[in-house]
C-alpha cells in the first residue's frame, strides 16, 4: 500500500505543481480510515496561506447532486413523496408542455429539460429556487419525458422546488438536518449563505479561477443560490469523503432506497450511468465506481467510490479544468488496482 500511495502522491503533485491548477485538495479513505490527505497551492487573492484538506473550503459543483440524492432518499424513506409522482402534484402552476414529468425524471436527468444557454451559467443575480425556475420553465422540452437522457442542472433546480414543498421547509434546512448533520459533514455549507458565515469561515474559502490561454485569472462572480441542489455547496476534501463513505456503509437510507439511488437507469435499452444524483459506472474492469464529477465556474471536482475495494477518493480544484480528468483517472487507477481488497 505504501508504494501505491507514493505513486499516487507523485501523480497528484505533478498535476498541482506544474501550474496546471491554482489549488488542489485531495483525501483518500480505505476501509473507513483516511490514508491520504494533502493539499497544494494557496488560497489566492490577498491570502497567501497554503490550502489544507481538512479546513479549506472549495466549491464542490455537481457533487451537490449526490447530496441532493441522499436528501431525496430520506424523503422517500419518510414517505414524504414517491419517485413516480407527478411534479404537478406539488407545482400545479408549472407549465405542463403537454407532458407529465415525474420526480424520477428530474432526479435521473430524463425529463427533457434543457441545460444552460447564453450566459446563464455565469449569472450573478440573486435568485431563490422558485425564481430560478423562470429561466427555463417556459421552454420546450428536448424530448418526451422518459424517452432519453440529457444531463442538466436545471433538473435539480426543479427537483429542489418540489422537495421543499413536500418537506414543508426550505430545501437547505432539510438537507442540513437530514444529510449533512446525519453524516457529521460539519464543513459543508450553502454557498449562498456565505455572507452569514464568520470572518474565519470566509478566510477558509479559496478564491475561484478560470483558465485562459495565458494562465489563470479570477473567475467571474456567480450566485449559485437558486441551484443549491445542483451545485451550490462549499466543502472540504475530508468532508466529501464522508459523503462517499455513506454509500459504502449504506447509512442514513433504507437498503431498498440505496438500491434506487445507486442503480443506473436504462433508456431505450441504453445505460445512462446515472442513478439518483449519483453517477454509476458498473463496467470498469469488473470494479465499478459510483460518485460524481463536478464542473462549474471556478471549480472542478471528483468524488469516486470503489465499493469492491472499500475505497473513497475526494478531490477538489478551484478552477474548471476538465482536461485534467485523464491524468486524475491515471492516479486513481494506481490505488484502485494496488490497494488490497
Q: For each of these PLM feature ranges, what is it?
A:
Residues 12, 26, 32, 56-84, ...:
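Active-site SXXK
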Residues 2-58, 80-82:
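Short, conserved catalytic-motif segment at the N-terminal edge
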Residues 270, 283-285, 320-341:
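Short, gly/Ser/Thr-rich active-site loops of penicillin-recognizing serine hydrolases
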Residues 44, 98-295:
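Short, surface-exposed loop or secondary-structure junction motifs
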Residues 41-45, 224, 320-322:
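A short acidic/small-residue loop/turn micro-motif
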Residues 301-319:
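Short, well-ordered beta-strand elements
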Residues 82-97, 182-183:
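Short, glycine/proline-biased beta-turn/loop segments that scaffold the active-site neighborhood
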Residues 39-41, 203, 301, 317:
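Short clusters of small/polar residues that mark proteolytic maturation junctions
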Amino acid at each position: 500500500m505504501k508504494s501505491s500511495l507514493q505513486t499516487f502522491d507523485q501523480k497528484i503533485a505533478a498535476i498541482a505543481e506544474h501550474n496546471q491548477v491554482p489549488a488542489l485538495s485531495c483525501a483518500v479513505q480505505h476501509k473507513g480510515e483516511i490514508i491520504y490527505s494533502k493539499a497544494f497551492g494557496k488560497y489566492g487573492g490577498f491570502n497567501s496561506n497554503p490550502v489544507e484538506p481538512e479546513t479549506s473550503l472549495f466549491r464542490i459543483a455537481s457533487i451537490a447532486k449526490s447530496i441532493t440524492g441522499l436528501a431525496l432518499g430520506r424523503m422517500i424513506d419518510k414517505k414524504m413523496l414517491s419517485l413516480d409522482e407527478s411534479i404537478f402534484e406539488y407545482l400545479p402552476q408549472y407549465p405542463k408542455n403537454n407532458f407529465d414529468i415525474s420526480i424520477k425524471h428530474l432526479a435521473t436527468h430524463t425529463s427533457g429539460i434543457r441545460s444552460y444557454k447564453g450566459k446563464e451559467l455565469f449569472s450573478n443575480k440573486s435568485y431563490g429556487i422558485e425564481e430560478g425556475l423562470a429561466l427555463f420553465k417556459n421552454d420546450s422540452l428536448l424530448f418526451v419525458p422518459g424517452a432519453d437522457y440529457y444531463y442538466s442542472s436545471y433538473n435539480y433546480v426543479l427537483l429542489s422546488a418540489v422537495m421543499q414543498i413536500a418537506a414543508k421547509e426550505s430545501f437547505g434546512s432539510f438537507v442540513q438536518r437530514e444529510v449533512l448533520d446525519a453524516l457529521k459533514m460539519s464543513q459543508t455549507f450553502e454557498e449562498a449563505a456565505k455572507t452569514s458565515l464568520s470572518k474565519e469561515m470566509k478566510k477558509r474559502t479559496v478564491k475561484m479561477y478560470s483558465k485562459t490561454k495565458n494562465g489563470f485569472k479570477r473567475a467571474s462572480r456567480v450566485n449559485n443560490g437558486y441551484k443549491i441542489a445542483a451545485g451550490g455547496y462549499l466543502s472540504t476534501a475530508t468532508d466529501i469523503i464522508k459523503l462517499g463513505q455513506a454509500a459504502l456503509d449504506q447509512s442514513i437510507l433504507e437498503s431498498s432506497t440505496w438500491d434506487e439511488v445507486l442503480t443506473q437507469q436504462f433508456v431505450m435499452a441504453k445505460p445512462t450511468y446515472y442513478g439518483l444524483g449519483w453517477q454509476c459506472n458498473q463496467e470498469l474492469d469488473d470494479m465499478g465506481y459510483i460518485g460524481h464529477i463536478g464542473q462549474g465556474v471556478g471549480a472542478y471536482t471528483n468524488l469516486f467510490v470503489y465499493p469492491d475495494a472499500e475505497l473513497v477518493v475526494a478531490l477538489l480544484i478551484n478552477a474548471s479544468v476538465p482536461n485534467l480528468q485523464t491524468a486524475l483517472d491515471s492516479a486513481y487507477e494506481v490505488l484502485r488496482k494496488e490497494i488490497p481488497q
